[in-house]
Amino acid sequence: VTEFKRALPNAEIFASSNDQDVKCHTRISQFAIERAKRLVECGEHVFMLIDSITRMARSFNNTSKNNATMSGGVGVGALEIPRRLFAAARNTRTAGSLTILATALIETGSKMDDLIFLEFKGTGNMELVLDRKIAEQFYYPAVNIFKSGTRREELLLQSFQLDKIHMLRSE
């Protein structure tokens, strides 16, 4: 957080550290998204980084008052607010835009983490998968190009770039 504040002096940084209680995590999450929405309404283009959506969802799960649980120990309705927060990303025609980039914990061995990931996987429009084996070989960024991609990538890339990516993925 300190490094972000130093590197981005004009940015608003909202953070909640591990030593704070879950109510603080949920309160900051909701405050940050509401602030972002107001800026978009004023015509600003906002970029929000959520690290991690898994931890944020866990916090909302821990503050959930519902005793009924789904598989993985996630409370019924516990993901409703995190889903709404993540769904706030948009590009408006008359005002600004809100882009949300969220990290997710995967392959942790936790059924809850798997359920949270699957809940948000279909909501996003791109997925960037990092690979530990690539990082161990000191290649950075350690992106797994076979598991990474975006919806409608043909709108972002020139045809020759898209052809090369498809060729790489087919190998």
Which residues does each predicted region cover?
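P-loop NTPase catalytic core
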Residues: 1-171
